Regions:
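C-terminal structured subdomain/cap of oxidoreductase catalytic cores
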Residues: 144-145, 149-151, 288-294, 387-454
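Glycine-rich loop(s) and the adjacent beta-strand/alpha-helix scaffold that form part
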Residues: 92-99, 111, 139-218, 434, ...
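A glycine-rich dinucleotide-binding beta-alpha-beta segment and adjacent secondary-structure elements
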Residues: 124, 131, 327-422, 426
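Internal hydrophobic alpha-helix adjacent to the cofactor/substrate pocket in enzyme cavities
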Residues: 194-201, 321, 329, 436-456
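Conserved redox-cofactor binding core of oxidoreductases
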Residues: 1-140, 163-164, 213-217, 332, ...
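Short Gly/Pro-enriched turn/cap motifs at secondary-structure boundaries
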Residues: 182, 228-233, 254, 382-392
Length: 480
């Protein structure tokens, strides 16, 4: 469904102020029946009481729950339904975002009696006379030869957790380890390696090999590590980002990808690429920060764990974080002077449509700018992560894999994050896309067109959503 969400560069030629971005509609998980147990849970860092908030009104109402009776009523209803679902089914049944996408696709597959094998990794592709004829799949303790009538689609989620390929393609992580991805840990580049063994080419020439996102590292209640992507908080009024030198370096309200590129450009050679989000008590309790929730939820656990740094003064906060105190105080003083008039002469925070959309519409005159003046003060460390990889298998316009000489490999297709992305220097907008292919080709979602003009499958595809990730070794249907 369309959103009023603006393009990331809405002011650029051809940019749109809203209405072009698409998101999945919420999906009732009860439609999956007993198979709901196979659907991965949302990332804990992106949930509220276990609820994955959908893009749009969900986030708006939850952010305004203490300021609006209408929002408070909406949140109360949403929470009541969620806890009732948990009591009855063991999990929430209002699926949003990636969960809704995976759930709808799975429901369509089950309705068509399409078998879906979980925990069944591909061992190798079957190649005969230069064409891919199928795959050897490990299932129930034995290898099974699966032959394909028309072709094999590789859609294994890219390589966000392939340390060797990260080392080669991520300039900010020369040893492959200084990078954190919230993506499934099973996405280790299996599809790319399978393609290479079959003669395919992985394009590693892109200026950005992934969709960069600033993340913070937290410890979950069960002791495991969590990776929190920072999408919304950076744009809020009363929140800025600084380097260890105590200076701002970018418009904090810009897209996650642009923000990380600024992080990389600002870093000195050989030093850790990290920055700190800074805010005061008023902003923290009004909007939250990273994994830290807004009022009325408690924040003590995050302070005790060290995830959230707190200081009674800016100099005390600087001492805890290693930020240069004098420079930080100067930066805040300069910000506060301009913020009283709703201006940001240094970086123009709030000057772009995307900034304003992610800010606070109830705050004026600039929805992204406010003084940082109410102690105590807080900081969270940000490092570099990704939302998915861009470098991938080189294909033609019909998703057919190409070899090193640009020739089609018969029977082999790539989709989603296994396919080389159509952009890499920057990200123009948040989108879902679908493609119609010739009768001889298969779409990224695995839908066959039996003859020219046969659009029945495409209509079903559009009605249920579209997917870009199906891992060869993940034990669940979907997660995010």
């Amino acid at each position: 469904m369309p959103l009023t969400f603006p393009d990331y560069h809405a002011e650029a030629p051809g940019g749109a102020q809203g209405g072009r971005s698409m998101v999945t509609r919420p999906f009732d998980g009860r439609e999956l029946g007993a198979r709901i147990k196979d659907l991965g849970s949302p990332l804990p860092e992106l949930t509220v009481f276990g609820i994955m908030l959908g893009s749009g009104k969900d986030i708006v109402h939850f952010m305004r729950a203490t300021k609006s009776l209408a929002s408070a009523a909406y949140v109360a209803k949403r929470l009541s339904k969620h806890f009732l679902d948990v009591a009855r089914h063991g999990r929430g049944m209002t699926l949003t975002n990636g969960n809704a996408l995976a759930g709808r696709l799975a429901k369509s597959a089950f309705d068509l009696n399409i078998p879906l094998w979980l925990s069944s990794p591909v061992r190798e592709l079957i190649v005969e006379r230069g064409a891919v004829r199928g795959a050897v799949v490990a299932r129930d303790g034995r290898d099974v030869r699966v032959l394909a009538r028309r072709g094999v689609v590789l859609a294994c989620g890219g390589f966000p957790h392939d340390v060797a390929r990260r080392q080669k393609m991520f300039p900010h992580a020369p040893d492959g380890t200084a990078h954190w991805s919230p993506g499934p840990e099973g996405n280790t580049g299996d599809g790319l390696r399978l393609a290479e063994k079959a003669g395919g080419r992985v394009d590693d020439t892109l200026p950005n090999a992934a969709a960069w996102v600033p993340v913070s590292i937290t410890t979950r209640k069960d002791g495991s590590r969590g990776v929190m992507p920072h999408f919304i908080d950076r744009a809020k009024p009363g929140v800025i980002a600084v380097t260890r030198a105590g200076r701002r370096f970018a418009n904090e309200g810009n897209s996650y990808h642009d923000f990380v590129q600024d992080m990389i450009r600002t870093a000195k050679p050989g030093e850790e690429i990290s920055v700190f989000l800074i805010c005061d008590h008023r902003a923290l309790r009004r909007y939250g920060l990273g994994c830290v929730p807004p009022f009325p939820l408690p924040i003590g656990r995050h302070v005790r764990s060290g995830y959230l740094k707190r200081g009674a003064t800016l100099s005390a906060l600087a001492a805890q974080t290693g930020i240069e105190a004098a420079a930080l105080e100067t930066t805040i003083a300069e910000l506060n002077k301009a913020a009283s008039e709703g201006r940001d002469p240094a970086f123009g925070k709030g000057s772009r449509a995307y900034n304003r959309y992610m800010g606070d519409a109830l705050h004026g005159p600039n929805p992204c700018i406010a003084p940082i003046a109410h102690p105590p003060f807080y900081a969270i460390k940000l490092v570099i992560g990704d939302l998915g990889t861009y470098a991938g298998i080189k294909t033609d316009a019909h998703a057919r894999a190409l070899d090193a000489d640009g020739r089609i490999i018969p029977g082999l297709y790539a989709a989603g994050n296994d396919m080389r992305a159509s952009w890499a220097a920057t990200i123009p907008a948040r989108v879902l896309r679908w493609d119609r292919h010739s009768p001889s080709a298969i779409s990224p979602a695995g839908i066959w067109l039996k003859k020219p003009g046969d659009v029945r499958a495409i209509r079903s595809y559009m009605r249920t959503g579209c997917s870009e990730k199906m891992s060869s070794n993940r034990p669940t249907l979907g997660r995010s």
